[in-house]
Amino acid sequence: MEYESRSGLVALLHRLGLEYRKPEVIPRHLDETKQRAFIKLYEKLMNALGADEAVLFVDAVHPTHGARAAGCWAAKNEHLAIEQTTGRQRLNIHGAIDLETGRTKMIEAEAIDAASTIKLLAGIEALYSTTALIHVFLDNARYHHAKIVRKWLSQPGRRIALHFVPSYCPHLNPIERLWALMHQHLTHNKTYPTCREFADAILNFLRDEVPRKWGEFCDSVTDNFRVVLPANFRILA
């Protein structure tokens, strides 16, 4: 059976109950027990959260100053292009977000390491100066477990408690969704003449626009956690 038109083939696929889908990228090593335990712990903490406590999610992101093409709608016979940049410098941003308010703390660093972790945590404490206890959820990167970070946290008067997301589970850290939102708004099909302009746009979005427009963005950056299991997918490759 041959179909001479794309529309005819698409119609056949729909009649066969098929849809055009983009596969999810899932980690190779997923522990169901650890995922369920984390979600249970998180829900318990949130249900008992005091009025003088806050919850933030921390992660690092490394946007690259370069053209990032993405699919979009256009006239049928129109050829689209975006200009390539002259370099591929990379930003190093260590950041945190409060899902309740949309408040963020973002630092630009030479490198993401134990020093940037301490700088970020200190900035969070300063931002939440009247909050008795600040719960910070973050991944298991080695620098988050560094000896100098633990030493800093043990100092008298510190108000931060760290909670680690299970390994290989970026879907359990909502700030990952913020990074996706950032790319959607700032890097897809956009180009910036200089790296400084690129950095300014990224940092302005994360520091100012996200909190200011949180009512618009909050449904895209949520703690609607789910357990991800390879058995629930047909693995293509």
What is the role of each PLM region?
Residues 1-30, 54, 61-63:
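Conserved short alpha-helical interface segments
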Residues 32, 138-140, 147, 163-187, ...:
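RNase H-like two-metal-ion nuclease catalytic core shared by retroviral integrases
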Residues 36-122, 223-237:
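Extended, low-complexity cationic-aromatic segments
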Residues 67, 114-163:
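RNase H-like DDE/DDD metal-dependent nuclease/strand-transfer catalytic core used by mobile genetic elements
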Residues 79-86, 154-174, 191:
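RNase H-like polynucleotidyl transferase catalytic core
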